[in-house]
Amino acid sequence: DGRYMRSWLEPVPGSLSFPGLPTSRHYGIKPEPLAARRGDCTTFDTHTLSLSDLPCGSPPVDRDKQSHEGAFSENNGESEANGEKPHIDPNNPAANWLHARSTRKKRCPYTKHQTLELEKEFLFNMYLTRDRRYEVARLLNLTERQVKIWFQNRRMKMKKINKDRAKDE
């Protein structure tokens, strides 16, 4: 039903919108912090459209065209009849969930050097202290999170190998 979608995307007649202030229409939705609004490229671990999906330095109008071009070509016949495209505010979380893209990074395999060093470290110690994790990450040009997850996965692999070995005997 188009009326529910339109209520989020089109401004309510007679209402004013002030950037940075929540409006009465967005009950229970936490507004984004002002620091991450414009020009800041930060990474979020959420699965909604964030400013990190948009190119830095481009004006907000260009960003809007790039991220939402043709998004309503089949759903919004009323706007097409008028010859205008609906304006979608990239700072409005209520509109963004309709066009959410995953912000997950593509899978990037470790280099042979990184794998070798991680395996050596694992043979020496299956668990890393926070300081050692920081050091390994810095030496291998990885994030601490990547090192932490690699060690978690390696421990699970070890557990599986041991279980299979016990089953075979």
Swiss-Prot record:
Single GO molecular function: DNA-binding transcription factor activity, RNA polymerase II-specific
Residues covered by region (Disordered): 52-95
DNA-binding region per Swiss-Prot/TrEMBL record: 103-162
Keyword terms: Developmental protein, DNA-binding, Homeobox, Nucleus, Transcription, Transcription regulation
SUPFAM superfamilies reported for this sequence: Homeodomain-like
Keyword Nucleus: yes
InterPro entries hit by this protein: Abd-B_homeobox_TF, HD, HD_metazoa, Homeobox_CS, Homeodomain-like_sf, Hox9_activation_N
A single GO cellular-component term on record: nucleus
Protein name: Homeobox protein Hox-A9
Organism encoding this protein: Gallus gallus
Gene name of this polypeptide: HOXA9
